[in-house]
Curated annotation (Swiss-Prot):
GO terms, molecular function: 4-phosphoerythronate dehydrogenase activity; NAD binding; protein dimerization activity
Name recorded for this polypeptide: Erythronate-4-phosphate dehydrogenase
E.C. designation(s): 1.1.1.290
Function: Catalyzes the oxidation of erythronate-4-phosphate to 3-hydroxy-2-oxo-4-phosphonooxybutanoate.
Organism of derivation: Aeromonas salmonicida (strain A449)
Catalytic activity from the UniProt record: 4-phospho-D-erythronate + NAD(+) = (R)-3-hydroxy-2-oxo-4-phosphooxybutanoate + NADH + H(+)
Pathway where it operates: Cofactor biosynthesis; pyridoxine 5'-phosphate biosynthesis; pyridoxine 5'-phosphate from D-erythrose 4-phosphate: step 2/5
Amino acid sequence: MKIVVDENMPHALELFAEFGEVIPLPGRQMQAVDLQDADVLLVRSVTRVDAELLATSPRLRFVGTATIGTDHVDKALLAVRNIPFFSAPGCNKYSVGDYVLSTLLVLAERHELNLREMSLAVIGAGNTGECVACKAEALGMRVLRCDPPRARVAGQAGETDAFVDYQTALGADIVSFHVPITREGPDATFHLLDEQVIAARPAGQILVNASRGEVWDNQALLARQQGLEPLRLVMDVWEGEPEPLRALVPHTEIATPHIAGYSLEGKARGTWMLYQALCQQLGRAARQDLQSLLPAPEVRALTPGQPVDQALIKQLVHLIYDVRRDDARFRNRIELPGSFDEQRKHYPERRELSSLHVNGPFASDTLARLGFTVQPG
C-alpha cells in the first residue's frame, strides 16, 4: 500500500508505516502525477483535493484531511468515485481556544480591560467555537452564540434562547469567528465581514478571525484601519494565503500565520484521528495511542500562591502559550519570500493548557474550565 501524505503532517511516518510505504510531499505542490500509484491520500488545508489532483489516481481508496475544515476537498467528487473520506473534526479545538484566550489576555493588559465586564460573540458554535465560548464563560464573560444552522435545529426543538442572530452578535464587545468557508446558500460565509459590516463597527471593537481568511474582506478592513477610527484586529488567517495583505499587518493588534490550531496535541490529534479511521476502514485494531506520540512538557506542574483572578490567569496561560511570540515572529519575517509557509512548517513546540497540572488550594474550577489539569487540595 502506498500512502501519500503532506510532509508537514506530524507523526505520519510512525503511525502509517505499519500499512505500507509512506511518501511525504509538500502539500501545496502535490500534483496528479504524485498519486498515480497511491492507495491513500492524507492532506492538510493547503492541498486542494479536486478533479485535477485526482485525474490519474485509479487505485485511490481513502482520502483524509487532518483538519477540522473540509472546504479544500471536493467531497462530491469523492462520493461519485466511491472513495471514503475522513476529516478530523475538533482535533485542534483546544489549541484554537488557547490561542483566543491568550490574545484576549494580551489585549486586556494592553488596553486595561476587565474581561468579566465584557461580552464575547462566537460566530460559528461548532467544536471550535463552542470551546472558545466555554473558555470565555470561565473568564466570567457574557457569551453570545451565533450559528444559523444550529439555531434552526434548536428552534425546531423549542430551544429559542440558545442562539442570537448575526446583527445581535455583532453588538458584542468582542466578536470571534469560527466558521467554515462557504460561498453559496443562505448561510454563506464568504466575506461575512464585508465592507458594509466593517463600516458599521464601532471604533475599538475587538474582532478575531481564526477560521478562514476569506470570511473577512481584507481590503475593506485595510481601508477602515487607515481611517481615524480603527478596529482592534486579531488575525490568524488571511485572504490570499500564503501571500497575506502585508499592508494590513501593521494595523492589527495580533497577527499570526494560520497557526492557531498548531499545538503539539492538536496536530498529533488530527493525524491520529486519520490513523484510527484508516484502521477502522481496513478492519484492523489500532496499535498506537495519542499520548505515546507526545513528549513530556517542559513545565508539568505548578502550585499558585494566590486566589484566581485575571492577572493570575494571564500568568498561567502565558506560561504555556504567549501569542505575542508568534506575533513578533510573523511581523519580523513578513517581508521574507515564502515566510508564511516557512513559519508554519517550522513552528516551535507549543503545548495545550491541559499539559500543565495546577495543584493546591487555589486550583479552582475556573482553571479547569479554562483547560488546565486541576488537582485541588
